[in-house]
A protein has these predicted regions:
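Hydrophobic, regular-secondary-structure patches
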Residues: 26-105
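Membrane interfacial helix motifs at helix-loop boundaries and amphipathic/re-entrant anchors
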Residues: 35-45, 49, 64, 230-250, ...
Length: 373
């Protein structure tokens, strides 16, 4: 350990550049992972962060909440299924509003006050409980508590009484309102509509009943519907699986590159100092001591690289665009860190093999080491 640490102190530029290069690569992995989380939130954050743990769609909607239509009769049948504790209609639509003199598109989500479907990430203000009140997602730039928005025609005003976070839907900021307000907004946008139907039913199971059991019971009891747990509804939403798959490939390649860069650097370093390592073996240093020194250097370099990566990630998230807020998820970063460190240590396995192959007798068989030719 002493010799390994001394080598780093004698060549700080070499090891510093390596730590910086690996740190940039790890930052790339962390940033892409954070970006993936932000993108998924922008697609389905409003579904993920609402209080209903089971969502019921029309079976013809292919798990797309904006394409789903359910009649009041279906909503009542779902609420009557054994195991359903609470249930309420959920309306979802994209509408154009006037806010501070400018047009803005918002995903409107209507739920009956006190029933499932309420936003769970409220950061300020209060829930919308009365007609004409709304809770806007923080991604709706320029909207603040006390502001009033109207439909594009200047009708049906909605006053913002609260703000929520991580609640976008289909990459649009959201406006949570009471279901009665949702119906009013839909009629104002389409005066010729004869009725406003629910898009889904948000359900909370009875105490002691699992989400999966309630979803299965609804599917077996009510024809023409598809009941999914909240996590299933989020995973099956349009665009989610393709986004996950694309970024997962890039993440995997970046992790492999980090491991290869670390492994190749220490392999080159080991080859360059083979003569010194051979002398150490000749004077009695065990191979295990040299291997421990190698892993000590790798651990120090990776530790510094991780600090650099985390620092860059904090700076990037602090300056992110409000339209796509980046939130660091410690659990995901910890998982990535374990994978990166594990693969990097595996990447230096060839260097370890080189060290273990060094025999003390080579010190007396190499002229360059003072041995006999």
């Amino acid at each position: 350990m002493l010799l390994a640490s001394r080598e780093i102190r004698r060549a700080p530029v070499r090891f510093g550049l390596l730590a910086g290069a690996i740190g940039l690569l790890i930052f790339l992995v962390f940033f892409q992972q954070t970006l993936l989380s932000a993108l998924l939130n922008s697609f389905t954050g409003a579904l993920q962060n609402q209080s209903g743990t089971v969502l019921v769609f029309s079976s013809e909607a292919r798990e797309n909440v904006e394409a789903s239509v359910l009649s009041p009769d279906i909503v009542a049948k779902v609420a009557a299924v054994p195991g359903v504790g609470q249930a309420g209609p959920l309306g979802v639509a994209t509408l154009t509003f006037l806010a501070r003199g400018q047009q803005v598109d918002l995903a409107v989500i209507g739920a009956e006050p006190g029933k499932p479907g309420q936003p769970t990430k409220l950061i300020s203000g209060r829930p919308a409980t009365a007609a004409g009140e709304g809770v806007a997602s923080a991604e709706a730039q320029g909207l603040a508590i006390g502001d009033t928005v109207t439909t594009a025609a200047g009708r049906s005003p909605v006053t913002i009484v609260g703000l929520t976070e991580q609640s976008q839907l289909s990459v649009l900021p959201t406006l949570f309102v009471a279901y009665a307000t949702y119906m009013t907004l839909r009629k104002a946008a389409n005066p010729d509509a004869t009725a406003v139907l629910a898009s889904a039913v948000a359900v909370i199971p009875s105490s002691g009943v699992s989400q999966q059991a309630v979803a299965a019971s609804i599917n077996a009891t009510v024809p023409g519907v598809a009941a999914l747990t909240r996590s299933e509804a989020v995973a099956n939403a349009p665009g989610v699986s393709s986004t996950k798959g694309s970024i997962a490939i890039v993440l995997a390649l970046a992790v492999v590159v980090v491991a290869l860069v670390t492994g190749f650097f220490f392999l080159i370093l080991t080859v360059q100092k083979t003569a010194s390592l051979t002398l150490l073996r000749a004077v009695g240093a065990p191979a295990s001591y040299l291997v421990r020194g190698l892993f000590h250097q790798v651990t120090l370099v990776l530790g510094v690289a991780l600090l650099i990566a985390v620092g860059l990630l904090l700076a990037a998230t602090a300056t992110a665009n409000a339209g796509l807020p980046l939130t660091i998820e410690p659990r995901a970063l910890l998982t990535s860190t374990v994978v990166i460190v594990g693969l990097s240590l595996l990447g230096v396995a060839f260097s370890v093999w080189r060290v273990l192959r060094i025999e003390p007798v080579q010190a007396v068989s190499r002229p360059g080491l003072g041995g006999i030719e």
